[in-house]
Amino acid sequence: MTEKGKHQLDAFIALLESNDREGAVAFALGLLERGDMTIPELYEEILAPSLNRIKVPRETEDELIWREHLQSAIVQAVMGACWPFLLLQRQKYGMPGRNTRVLLVAPEEEYHEIGIRMGMDFFVLLGYQVDYIGCNTPRDTMLNAVKTLKPDLVCISVTNYLNLAQLPAIIAAVKANKPAPRVFIAGSALARTGKNALDFGADGALTSFESIREIREVKQ
């Protein structure tokens, strides 16, 4: 990260620490309006690091977890305010995902939502047809959505590594559909296991905007 980028991150973190929702939104939109950052740069260099810095030891959860939730809500407000810029920037990337449908979902008992929300915006930015279901989705609900919507790609996000145990059965059931969609795993849980997406029966892992850009076999 450049020195300028570090100053921008520190300035945003200060706004989060002071619970300044309006200031955080104005700061982020200012970066986009001036052309200092693109949507992916804002998300990956400012928003994600600002939240990833938060560590809540189990013994202090009752005291600190509300701070994490409050700052997460501010980041979600920033992301919502970025939507007009997201639509404006789509042409820059050539719409490689046009005519390709992606379903984004997190399994049951997975409550972390910001990462998959960022993924949704990245897919939209690349021109995909996006169906975003969100977090804590029961297995049968997910499978019904796949059967009804018939996505070309399914992205399953897992942040809590304990939720990885249910993935092989879910992915196998998703791929039992005909035609079978390609399935990708997103979220930070995978990095903590020493395993890769193939070990869970998935076609790959999505860890960044660039990894989404590298997806091939889109419909033209």
Describe the residue ranges of each PLM region:
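Long amphipathic alpha-helical segments
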Residues: M1-M95
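Conserved hydrophobic helix-helix packing surfaces used for dimerization/oligomerization
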Residues: T100-V102
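Short helix-loop-beta junction
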Residues: R117-D131
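Cofactor-cradling patches in redox/metallo enzymes
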Residues: V124-L125, T137-G194
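Glycine-enriched alpha-helix->loop->beta-strand junction motifs that scaffold or abut catalytic
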Residues: Q129, K150-D152, F200-D203
